[in-house]
Each structure stands twice: as C-alpha cells, then as structure tokens.
Amino acid sequence: MERLQVTERHTFFMKYYLAPMEGLTTYNFRTNWNRCYGGMDKYFTPFISNRHMNSRERNDVLPEHNVGMYTVPQILTNKAEEFLSLAEQLAGYGYHEVNLNLGCPSGTVVARNRGAGFLGTPRELEDFLDEVFEKCPLEISIKTRIGMDYMDEWAPLLKIYQKFPMKELIIHPRLQKEGYKGTPHLEAFAEAVEALQCPLCYNGDITSPESLTQILTKLPSIDTVMIGRGILQNPGLLQELKAASTESVALPSCEERLAVLKEF
C-alpha cells in the first residue's frame, strides 16, 4: 500500500468522523464497529426528524447506547422551535454538540424544504439560524451541500455561514441535484477555506488511502474528514488511512472481532 503523501500536520493531527447514514449507522452499528475497529474522533447519528423522538430515535441517542464514543446527534428540520426542543432534550442526556442536516439530497426530504432543500430558501435559512444560534443550549455544527442546482448558490451561502459561531462546518462539495454522482467540487471547499474562520471538515468520496491523498493534494489545509459509504464498503478503511499516514494503529484480534460480530 502506498503511503499518503501528506504534510506533517496531517500525519499527526488528522481527525476522522463517521458520517450519519439513515437506517445504517444506528447505535448498533456504531457500537459494534467501534468495538471491532474504533478510532473515529466523532460519530454522527442518523438524523432525528421528530420533535417528540420516537422510540428508534430515542434509543439511538441514549447515553447507555453510546458509551466510549464522542457522539453527535443530528437534527433534520426547517423549524427553529423543533430544533430547539430537540436540542433541549439532547442537552438533558448530557450532549454538548448537535448537528444540523443541510446536506441530505433525498427527494422526499428536499420536497419538504429540509436537508439540502433548505438551501434553496436562503432568507428563511438565515432567519432559522439567527434564532437557533441565539437560543440553543448546545454548540451547533452544520453538515451542508454547496447548493441545490447551481454552483453560484455557494457564495451567498458562505456569506450566511460567516455570520454564525458554528462549532464546525462539514462540507460535502456537491449540489443537491447531483446526489452522489460525478466528482466533488473541490474548488467549492477551497472557497470555504478562504471565506470562513470556523473549523471545516471535508466529506465525500473517501474510499481508499489513494482517494484521500488526491483530495489532500488539492486541499492541503484539510485536517478533518468525514467518512460514510467508504466504511460500509470496507469496515477497515479507517485503519488503512491511518496506517498509510504513518499513524500507529492498534486493532482487536480476529478472535475479538468475531466475538463482537456473534453478539451483533
């Protein structure tokens, strides 16, 4: 395996997050993946979309189901009062950070003006952010696409994001209409690096050490990445990324992993 051609900063300070994937990265998956492999700096839950959490959503964020992991619950809504109500409940469970989903490209979600669909109404989005950043008891991070249909939507969105003290902005540099097809627009991430002062995280098409090398070559300032589908395709991907960047990696034995899988 080729070693990542990265800077010393990347070798020692790269952070890795597990992406939220609806119906897939539930607490059962997160817990057992963490026991078999581990090493993620943050684990993001699939989105919560009900003001009054249903049993599945509540089980996913219960502290006893997230032991040993820095878990960040994600909320999908376009109503400030719903976001704040859920944030209050999550604060009661001891969480310190909540993530706003502005990235889901699903047609059913977008049709309700949520997820990436909320990006299509920037004035309403800014009003929403005004209220939640003023009143939320938790730190807020955001996961975003770069627009709905056109690349020129990104610059106005960056101007909105500049106004708010977000914990972190996680950018999947594709438009909503692109789904997961085509090549991520790395130049859009570079524009965010120039425009924003908050911490940034890159998300999109990290499936191998080589793919991460290509991204870092073009975006050398990246020190945090979020991985989703790549982990589902190759559960050991994170360890391959760390090994390629010369980080020391301690893995459970095959027998220990098998024992966990039998429990699952």
What are these regions (language model features)?
Residues R3-T7, F12, Y16-Y17, Y27-N28, ...:
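Alpha/beta catalytic cores of nucleotide-metabolism and tRNA/nucleoside-modifying enzymes
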Residues F12-K15, R51-Y70, C104, A111-R112, ...:
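N-terminal small/glycine-rich loop or linker at the start of catalytic domains
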Residues Y16-A19, Y43-T45, T71-I75, V98-L100, ...:
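Hydrophobic faces of well-ordered beta-strands that scaffold small-molecule active sites
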Residues M21-G23, I48-N50, L76-N78, G103-P105, ...:
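Active-site beta-loop-alpha junctions enriched in small/polar residues
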Residues M21-Y93:
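Glycine-rich, positively charged N-terminal anion/phosphate-binding segment
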Residues R35-Y37, L84-V98, L102-T108, R112, ...:
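Alpha/beta enzyme core
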Residues T77, L119, R123, T183, ...:
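Conserved phosphate-coordination/catalytic loops
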Residues N113-L119, E178, S245:
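Short glycine-enriched, charge-decorated loop/helix-capping segments at active-site entrances
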